[in-house]
């Protein structure tokens, strides 16, 4: 992302924080910034002085970015749920706009952080370039044109494998140059579930079924397959979120229009016979697009994708294997559990544990069978974090 920002007009990546300060520094040098232009600091006073001299700042603590006066927007790209919550909270408390390139934190406490940001007069937002942000762009485009949006969703580039773990994906992870836990979170589906939950929380849509249908389709097949069952499709209801095997890395919305004149025009424009049509974006550029969200927050005072209110959907925890009382769990992308999207009210009625609250300090209190939804009475949740 730093390499992208240095070539964008009107924006400067002033501070990079990483617990390994050498990595923070390397993000600048990889972007073509000379080493004599990079200063390593330990506090916000030194950071501000360096910025005023036109230097770039590397540091270990995110608090430096949150507290340095010249900084207007902070991006959380940690992927850590509790750390992400702390970064967002401290950014807000210090009157900085906060961009979450961390869907997992947003999924768990996004509505709370959004309320705190509103009260502080700053913007809390998800990131452009992530699938939820890309979907929101299509959703806003469609609704502003008067279309009725029926389905929103994303492509998935590998089939679900609930049994995978960092050991079974190690070879693939090495080949792709990615961390095994990250590849596991993709293949087990938790990452997709989290991203769909953000779409729900921003639009008010819900999953049609727990975990989604996850149909196989090409782009042209999506509108018909995402019709109601009585119309020959798979859906029980419209106003839903889902994912498709076969159209990754794209995102989509399925729309219709109440007027025949518009539907006829859509068919003339080669959008299909209707009544459902797909608006499809064949790419999402991840962190390369994130700076656009920072610019929108600072310049326009708007978010890319934000929760409408409270949680609409949640990602509940499911046992990946038989678990014994006394064991400790580990969270998504690992060995003991994965997540499935569910309507928030249903998850609440079930007393289901959100996947974002499960970590290595989560203790199993009673035996749990593989495939069983984990509820609060089954485990002891770690209460040491701000979550």
Predicted feature residues:
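N-terminal glycine-/serine-/threonine-rich beta1-alpha1-beta2 phosphate-ribose binding loop
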Residues: 1-88
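Short, ordered loop/turn segments at secondary-structure junctions
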Residues: 18-21, 63, 79-80, 102-106, ...
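Rossmann-fold NAD(P)-binding glycine/threonine-rich loop
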Residues: 78-94, 101-122, 127-129
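Generic secondary-structure signature for well-ordered alpha-helical cores
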Residues: 6-10, 29, 33, 115-123, ...
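Rossmann-like NAD(P)H-binding beta-loop-alpha module
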Residues: 117-121, 125-187
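Structural detector of well-ordered beta-strand residues that form the stable sheet scaffold
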Residues: 59, 99-100, 125, 150, ...
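C-terminal catalytic/substrate-binding lobe primarily of soluble NAD(P)-dependent oxidoreductases
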Residues: 171-387
């Amino acid at each position: 992302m730093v390499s992208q920002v240095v070539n964008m007009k009107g924006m400067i990546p002033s501070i990079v924080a990483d617990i390994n300060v050498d990595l923070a520094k390397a993000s600048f040098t990889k972007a073509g910034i000379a080493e004599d232009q990079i200063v390593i600091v330990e506090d916000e006073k030194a950071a501000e002085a360096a910025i005023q001299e036109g230097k770039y700042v590397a540091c270990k603590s995110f608090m430096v970015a949150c507290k340095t006066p010249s900084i207007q927007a902070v991006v959380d790209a940690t992927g850590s749920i509790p750390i992400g919550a702390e970064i967002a909270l401290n950014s807000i408390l210090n009157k900085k706009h906060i961009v979450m390139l961390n869907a997992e934190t947003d999924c768990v406490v996004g509505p709370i952080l959004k309320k705190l940001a509103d009260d502080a007069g700053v913007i809390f937002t998800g990131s452009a370039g992530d699938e939820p942000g890309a979907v929101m762009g299509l959703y806003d485009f469609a609704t502003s044109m008067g279309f009725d949006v029926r389905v929103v969703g994303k492509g998935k580039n590998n089939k679900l494998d609930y049994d995978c773990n960092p050991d079974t994906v190690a070879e693939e992870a090495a080949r792709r140059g990615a961390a095994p836990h990250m590849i596991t979170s993709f293949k087990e589906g938790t990452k997709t579930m989290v991203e769909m939950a953000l779409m729900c929380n921003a639009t008010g849509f819900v999953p049609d079924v727990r975990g989604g249908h996850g149909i196989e389709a090409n782009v042209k097949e999506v509108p018909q397959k995402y019709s109601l069952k009585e119309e020959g499709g798979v859906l029980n209801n419209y106003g839903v979120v889902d994912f498709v095997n076969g159209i990754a890395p794209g995102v989509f919305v399925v729309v219709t229009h109440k007027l025949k004149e518009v539907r006829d025009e859509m068919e003339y424009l080669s959008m299909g016979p209707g009544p459902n049509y797909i608006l499809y974006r064949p790419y999402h550029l991840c962190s390369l697009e994130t700076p656009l969200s920072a610019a929108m927050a600072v310049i326009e005072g708007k978010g890319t994708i934000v929760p409408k209110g409270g949680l609409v959907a949640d990602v509940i925890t499911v046992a990946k294997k038989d678990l014994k009382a006394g064991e400790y769990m580990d969270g998504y992308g690992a060995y003991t559990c994965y997540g499935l999207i569910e309507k928030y009210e249903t998850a609440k009625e079930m007393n289901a544990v959100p996947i974002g609250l499960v970590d290595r300090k989560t203790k199993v209190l009673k035996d749990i069978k593989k495939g069983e939804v984990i509820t609060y009475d089954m485990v002891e949740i770690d209460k040491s974090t701000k979550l």
